[in-house]
From Swiss-Prot:
The lineage of its organism: Bacteria, Bacillati, Actinomycetota, Actinomycetes, Mycobacteriales. It comes from Rhodococcus sp. NHase catalyzes the hydration of various nitrile compounds to the corresponding amides. Industrial production of acrylamide is now being developed using some of the enzymes of this class. The modification Cysteine sulfenic acid (-SOH) is found at C107. Heterodimer of an alpha and a beta chain. Signal peptide: none annotated. InterPro entries: CN_Hdrase_a/SCN_Hdrase_g_sf, CN_Hdrtase_a/SCN_Hdrlase_g, CN_Hdrtase_asu/SCN_Hdrlase_gsu, Nitrile_hydratase_asu. This is Nitrile hydratase subunit alpha. Binds 1 Fe(3+) ion per subunit. Disulfide bonds: none annotated. Inactivated by oxidation of Cys-107 to a sulfenic acid. Its cofactor is Fe(3+).
Length: 199
């Protein structure tokens, strides 16, 4: 069994091949593909999650509500929908880092993170992140955490969808929510990557 998570290039090549076949067979059109991409890039997905994270970084009362009941707190910002009925947000600290996985399939909080990345659905990721999280984070995602940081893995399911509230980067005091949201990445809300470094 191959335990190596496919590279983004390998995944992209597979997707492109499948897309070409479906277009050639008139199952879908390029306009349909473009529209679906636009929906998940602009109307659903990581940009919305980044908006929630930035709000939590700047509003302690909202952050408390988010950590208490993420589903309801997200609704305050107009964010809800399929695959986001029961969400729990996990706060990263200096001592504890969280990462999410669905060991059974690919359950994922779509309203805030969009479509799951292909690697998230791969059996290798689903098995290895549970057994050897520090190794997977460093070798597969080039994300190196201090040895003193405890890594907790959360198994998301159809009943409960977890996602991560990453730590606010230093040097962002006085930044607007819009500026802060630009630093938040999808991978930081999954727990497999950092937020962007402030410029």
């Amino acid at each position: 069994m191959n335990n190596i998570i496919p590279t983004q290039e390998e995944i992209a090549a597979r997707v492109k091949a499948l897309e070409s076949i479906l277009i050639e067979q008139n199952v879908i059109s390029t306009a349909m593909v473009d529209r679906m991409v636009e929906i998940y890039e602009e109307e659903v997905g990581p940009k919305l999650g980044a908006k929630v994270v930035a709000k939590a970084w700047t509003d302690s009362e909202f952050k408390a509500r988010l950590l208490d009941d993420a589903t309801e707190a997200c609704k305050e910002l107009g964010i809800s929908g399929l695959q986001g009925e029961d969400m729990v947000v996990l706060e990263d600290t200096d001592d504890v880092h969280h990462a999410i996985v669905c060991t059974l399939c690919s359950c994922y909080p779509w309203p805030v993170l969009g479509l799951p990345p292909n690697w998230y659905k791969e059996p290798a990721y689903r098995a290895r992140i549970v057994r050897e999280p520090r190794t997977v984070l460093s070798e597969e995602f080039n994300y190196h955490l201090p040895e003193s940081t405890e890594i907790r893995i959360w198994d998301t399911s159809s009943e409960m969808r977890y996602w991560v509230l990453p730590q606010r980067p230093e040097g962002t005091e006085g930044w607007s929510e819009e500026q802060l949201a630009e630093l938040v990445t999808r991978d930081s809300m999954i727990g497999v990557g950092p937020v962007k470094t402030p410029a």
